[in-house]
């Protein structure tokens, strides 16, 4: 696979016979070091993958051992791919290079589709995904449907990631003012200390200073959410209490009818 982003390029080749990672920089050594720094900052343990590759080279005589280290390296590369794609998106968002495809759609159906996609992930932690009420009628909004699905998905994933076993993630959609609705995603998980809240939308910022990797992710999800919402000229708000849970809310423009 081949990925390109602001600081240079990364080429990844992987099969049962060889694994190769090449970091190519437009400005040679300094930017190459910067590339590695960004990946480490994102919680990606490059040393771990390189160690797996190194062991792989010396295990030609043992097929099972080779496969073990190949699987480990493959997981690291999968995470690296995730980070690179998110870096590319956030760079484009910050530069204003990502155009929005504005259309009218039913936000309730969009949320339902996110629930369907994340049902198994939530079930693994016995977390219930639900609406606050039974929405019998569509709630029409205007925006980039694909990008806003990413917003809802990132926020629901976040609530699952930091939710408690047997917890809940509840979504509500309410009228705010005449031409606005507010979408609230509320969980009863571990919550966030107030001192961390102002920095949650920063790239790679983690409340857990150990940079826990067991939950995966790129560390860019909330930064992407903020940029997408702001690209729509809308607002996102966080309310949280440590030990009680969190609520992420964002506004959207209402629409009266489906685009013809």
Language-model-derived ranges and their functions:
Residues 192-204:
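Short conserved segment of the HATPase_c
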Residues 121-131:
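Short conserved segments within the C-terminal catalytic ATPase subdomain
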Residues 61, 65, 95-100, 138-143:
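Conserved micro-motifs of the catalytic ATP-binding
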Residues 233-234:
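Conserved glycine-rich
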Residues 159-160:
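Short helix-loop "hinge" at the ATP-lid/N-box region of the Bergerat-fold HATPase_c
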Residues 101-116, 130:
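A conserved beta-strand-to-alpha-helix junction within the catalytic ATP-binding
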Residues 75-80:
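Short alpha-helical segment of the dimerization/phosphotransfer core of two-component systems
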């Amino acid at each position: 696979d081949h990925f390109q982003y602001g600081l240079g390029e990364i080429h990844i080749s992987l099969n049962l016979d060889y694994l190769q990672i090449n970091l190519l920089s437009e400005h040679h050594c300094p930017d190459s070091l910067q590339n590695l720094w960004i990946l480490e900052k994102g919680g990606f343990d490059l040393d771990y993958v390189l160690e797996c590759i190194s062991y792989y080279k010396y295990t030609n005589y043992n097929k099972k051992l080779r496969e073990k280290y190949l699987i480990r390296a493959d997981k690291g590369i999968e995470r690296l791919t995730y980070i690179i794609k998110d870096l590319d998106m956030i760079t484009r968002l910050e530069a204003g290079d990502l155009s929005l495809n504005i259309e009218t759609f039913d936000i309730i159906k969009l949320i339902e589709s996110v629930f369907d996609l994340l049902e198994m992930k939530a079930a693994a932690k016995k977390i219930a995904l639900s609406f606050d009420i039974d929405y019998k009628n569509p709630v029409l909004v205007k925006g980039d449907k694909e990008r806003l699905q990413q917003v809802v998905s990132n926020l629901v994933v976040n609530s699952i990631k930091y939710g408690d076993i047997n917890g809940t993630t509840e979504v509500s959609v309410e009228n705010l003012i005449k031409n606005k609705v507010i979408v609230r995603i509320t969980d009863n998980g571990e919550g966030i200390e107030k001192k961390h809240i102002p920095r949650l939308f920063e790239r790679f910022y983690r409340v857990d200073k150990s940079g826990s990797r067991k939950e995966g992710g790129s560390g860019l999800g909330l930064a992407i959410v903020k940029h997408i919402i702001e690209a729509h000229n809308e607002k996102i708000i966080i309310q949280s209490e440590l030990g009680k849970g969190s609520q992420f809310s964002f506004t959207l423009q209402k629409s009266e009818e489906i685009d013809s």
